[in-house]
Amino acid sequence: MLYTWNIEKIIKDTLDKHNLNINYEFNNNLTVPMSYNVSTNTIKFNYLQVNGYISKIRIKETDENFVKILLYHVIGYYLDFKKNKHDIRTLMYGDEEEIEKLKSKIETNAWDYGRTLIPEPLLKSYDKVRELDKALIKNRLTNI
């Protein structure tokens, strides 16, 4: 099991390695393992959700490497928002189809941009987590 300080160290080391100026903090109320908040330029994480996600997505990686995979995906959101100025008003005021289309585009971009930074030894696992995450989300939506 990884604790807050373990995850914070992985985040700090990774951000330093890539000279990324992104804040980070833990948030025990977060309902997902990690997220990026564009308005505050902050990566937030919930260590309990991170550990729960690790147990759901079973791949042959250390817990530390799994956190790196999650982190690079979240950094992908940061890179997407830096490179593409999405009209966020669509998420608030758009119709259902527009909202889903934009969310899907942002999600795809996040995975793609995160993939550009992830170290070579983690690429196959990154792609596997992407595939399993998509299946997990699809399954969650069909089980409602």
PLM features: residue spans?
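Post-HEXXH active-site segment of zinc metalloproteases
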Residues: F81-D112
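A structural signal for well-ordered alpha-helical segments within the folded catalytic domains
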Residues: W5, H73, T108-D112
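Long, well-structured alpha-helical subdomains associated
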Residues: T62-N65, E98-S104, D112-I144
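Active-site scaffold of zinc-dependent metalloenzymes
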Residues: N23-N65, F81-K82
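Catalytic Zn2+-binding segment of zinc metalloproteases
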Residues: E64-L91
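A metal-dependent hydrolase signature that marks the N-terminal structural subdomain at the beginning
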Residues: M1-T40, P121
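The feature represents the first ordered module of a protein
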Residues: V50, L70-Y72, E97
